[in-house]
Regions:
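Transmembrane alpha-helices
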Residues: 137, 141, 174-207, 233-234, ...
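Alpha-helical membrane-protein architecture signal
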Residues: 45, 63, 67, 71, ...
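C-terminal transmembrane helix and the adjacent membrane-cytosol boundary/short C-terminal tail
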Residues: 156, 234-268
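Transmembrane-helix boundary motif in ABC transporter permease subunits
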Residues: 79-109
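N-terminal signal-anchor/first transmembrane alpha helix
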Residues: 1-29
């Protein structure tokens, strides 16, 4: 245990000093150059604090701008991602279990995956009009494919011996799916969900740039139009930090996946 803790501390410290060095260099260079479009990090942080985190203590220091910028974005992000997870895992399981179903549907999946989601924003605008439905639909269409394909691959790689053993002991249908198939496919499902959350973050921002009045994407457009580079960079930094934290959380879960997979195999 001590070795793991020491290794984690060393790994974190190794990354931390590099991040500090890069921020310091950014501060020094931008201060010396004085380019308006590239403000120093100190100005970006101060602007972000003033915009979003200078509210009253009873609201956790969040301002009205924070609620308008973060609330719709996080709602769109997690609504789209949750719908993607449910639909993607269900479709992936069906494709993995049924070769006949996969023969007809898998080509459609690969065709849909090849379409760049931004090219369909105008279509979604026509179908759903401007608003949350259009933004969530853009996210779902753009990020469902890695979930479907990873789930399908995970289901297809389940050890046949375990399935045969389950058949002998009368474990069939949904019970077999819950006890054997899903636990064995869990590492690849989690990997697909981790990839999809990063894509969902990108499409969240992109969809909000098209006529939306609220959300971090709308904030970026407004800041650029009003020539407020520090506010624009504050939004970019927020998106980057959010993406890093989400990826780190899924990486942690993914690292525990093989251990759980091993336990699931041992239990069968």
């Amino acid at each position: 245990v001590r070795g793991r803790v020491a290794g984690a501390v060393t790994w974190t410290a190794g990354r931390l000093w590099l991040a500090v060095l890069l921020v310091w260099l950014w501060e020094r260079v931008t201060t010396q150059v004085g380019e308006a479009y590239f403000p120093p990090p100190s100005e970006i942080v101060a602007t972000g604090r003033e915009l979003w985190f200078s509210g009253p203590a009873d609201r956790f220091f969040l301002t009205e701008e924070a609620v308008e910028d973060f609330g719709p974005s996080l709602l769109n992000l997690f609504a789209g991602w949750l719908l993607t997870g449910l639909a993607g895992v269900a479709l992936g399981v069906a494709l993995g279990l049924s070769r006949t179903f996969a023969r007809y549907v898998e080509p459609i999946v690969h065709f849909g995956r090849a379409i760049p989601p931004p090219t369909l924003i105008s279509v979604f605008l026509s179908v759903f009009a401007l608003g949350t439905s259009m933004q969530v639909a853009t996210i779902v269409f753009g990020v469902i494919w890695p979930v479907v394909l990873n789930t399908m691959d995970g289901v297809r790689t389940v050890d046949g011996l375990h399935l045969d053993s389950a058949e002998v002991f009368g474990v069939r249908g949904l019970r077999r799916l819950r006890m054997i198939v899903l636990p064995a496919a869990a590492p690849k499902i989690i990997a697909g969900l981790r990839i999809s959350i990063g894509l969902a973050l990108i499409l969240m921002v992109l969809s909000e740039m098209f006529g939306s009045k609220h959300g971090i994407g709308a904030h970026l457009v407004d800041s650029q139009r009003d020539f407020e580079p520090a506010a624009m960079w504050a939004g970019i930094v927020f998106v980057g930090v959010l993406g890093y934290l989400l990826n780190a959380a899924f990486t942690l879960v993914e690292r525990r996946g093989p251990h759980r997979h091993h336990l699931a195999r041992a239990a069968t």
